[in-house]
Amino acid sequence: MPDTVTALQFVNMEDQYIYDAAISANSYQLKLRNGTYEVKAEAGDYQTVSHIVVENQAVARDLLFLTTKKEKLEWVPDIYVGYDQKEHNYQTVREAVKACKAMNPSDESKRITVHIAPGVYREQVLVDTPYVTFINDEPEKEVLLTWYYGIGYEYYSIGADGYYSEAAAYDKFEKNTAQKWGAAVYIKNTATAFRAQNITFESSFNKYITDEELADGVTPGGPDIKNFERTKDSDVASGEATERASALAVEGSQSEFYECRIVSSQDT
């Protein structure tokens, strides 16, 4: 836990009774009766979205704390994903996009180019910052940005807003349905002048099942519930399984795509 955590409370979700945890050396301890609990914390610039279920036995549960502080970074024209020897390198595209936002480019002269190393990046990416470019500098190899959400299903990792949430993915407490047909990459209306070059955008939903999707607890649900169970052996490319699932959603003006592939099945 962060050093800034000064109080932890576990609230019984049935009767709202509050239990206070004893905090010591970045750990916590308390006694709870059977039930489901929401965790609330006093943690400075951090917050947690966590739940614990107690059923007749001791429970050990690490809590995920995420910073609420708005990061500011000095602007640089180039950042990298998957290039470990490079300065300003990030391990995921999502982290790189977050860094772009922290640099806050205000016009074309402050454009940030995200150089993405060839490989598979299984993550939902939301771009809400203007003047950002995604580029694959090795076009003979593929940069694949892919994700698995689709209409008619619920997933643990979807937050209340309908998009991937790191906190919800870790908590695995309740499921939600996707917005924008589960777009693998969503260029929001604030992301003016987005560019991509030599990138493949893919929705795997109607193509193949991933271990990550199964681990995310995919189940039929939502207002457009689909009467088809998605399992390791399911033929998700069949007509029976096909549903709306977008590889790319674009609302930002002046978006440009060069030598890109956009791959899905229904409503790409």
List PLM regions with ranges.
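Detector for repetitive beta-architecture
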Residues: 78, 111-113, 118, 124, ...
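Short, ordered, surface-exposed loop/turn motifs in non-cytosolic proteins
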Residues: 1-21
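Extracellular beta-strand-rich solenoid/capping regions of secreted or surface-exposed proteins
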Residues: 98-106, 122-134, 144-195, 206-227, ...
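Feature marks extracellular polysaccharide-active and adherence modules
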Residues: 82, 99, 117, 128, ...
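A short, solvent-exposed beta-strand micro-motif common in secreted/extracellular proteins
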Residues: 34-44
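Acidic Gly/Asp/Thr-rich repetitive segments characteristic of extracellular carbohydrate-active
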Residues: 78-115
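Structured interaction patches on ligand/partner-binding surfaces of diverse proteins
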Residues: 44-68
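Short, surface-exposed beta-strand/beta-hairpin micro-motifs centered on an aromatic residue
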Residues: 24-32
